[in-house]
Curated annotation (Swiss-Prot):
This is Small ribosomal subunit protein uS7. The keyword Repeat does not apply. One of the primary rRNA binding proteins, it binds directly to 16S rRNA where it nucleates assembly of the head domain of the 30S subunit. Is located at the subunit interface close to the decoding center. The lineage of its organism: Archaea, Thermoproteota, Thermoprotei, Thermoproteales, Thermoproteaceae. GO terms for molecular function: rRNA binding; structural constituent of ribosome. Keywords: Ribonucleoprotein, Ribosomal protein, RNA-binding, rRNA-binding. Part of the 30S ribosomal subunit. HAMAP family: Ribosomal_uS7_A. GO terms for biological process: translation. GO terms for cellular component: small ribosomal subunit. The keyword RNA-binding applies.
Length: 224
């Protein structure tokens, strides 16, 4: 038995394709699992069935594998490209545990996201999973800047952003926007998170994540 890029056991004659030294990431399985004949629903409410990732570049990295409870117990932590196998809602929950005093309080973060999804549905009437995916696609940056040194002089140059980093930055900015909104504000953080996701999904400039993406891409455009 050979081992896949995520540490899983592959059949004896399975062939892994590579581009150079980098293995090709396969899209996360989307089979709608059933439990006692019933479809698996996130939090017992939300279906993964008709959720569409419109950005081809992120399709292999946004994991929409149907789960009832988004908690993989860190099983992909040490695997290369393991983040691509973690359900996207769990990644949002994990980032809600940052920083400082919220570290490790996953049940608290779980309840925040669960209530935020209810608020998203009440405000939009749409599947919250689809709204989250649309928000991620809208705020994921396509280029950023990096520093290079030539002849002892440092320059900033524009570079394309890899799909995995695009997803990481999008989730980081969405959760940062929710925490920033709730700080010193009577509005609960779950409502702030819901408002941030809805604003990002509609590409609203009032969204913290949308402003961060525009700022980064503006700096990158000036460094071409």
């Amino acid at each position: 038995m050979s081992t896949g890029i995520f540490g899983e056991q592959l059949p004896k004659h399975t062939k892994i394709e590579y581009i150079g030294d980098v293995p090709i990431i396969e899209e996360c399985p989307r089979d709608i699992k059933t439990l006692n004949g019933e479809p698996v629903l996130l939090f017992g409410k939300w279906s993964f069935e008709n959720v569409v990732v419109k950005d081809p570049g992120l399709r292999r990295y946004i994991c929409l594998k149907p789960v009832l409870l988004p908690h993989t117990e860190g099983r992909y932590q040490k695997h290369r490209f393991g983040k691509a196998r973690i359900p996207i809602v769990e990644r949002l929950i994990n980032l809600m545990m940052r920083p400082g005093r919220n570290t490790g309080k996953k049940h608290k973060a779980y309840n925040i996201v669960k209530r935020a999804f209810d608020i998203i549905y009440y405000k939009t009437g749409q599947n919250p999973i689809q709204v989250l995916v649309d928000a991620i696609i809208n705020v994921a940056p396509r280029e950023e800047v990096t520093r290079i040194i030539m002849g002892g002089i440092a320059y900033t140059v524009s570079v394309d952003v890899s799909p995995q980093r695009r997803l990481d930055l999008a989730l980081r900015w969405i959760t940062e926007g929710a925490r920033t909104c709730s700080f010193n504000n009577p509005k609960p953080i779950e409502e702030c998170l819901a408002d941030e996701i809805i604003a990002a999904a509609s590409n609203d400039p009032r969204s913290y994540a949308v402003r961060k993406r525009e700022e980064l891409e503006r700096i990158a455009a000036a460094s071409r």
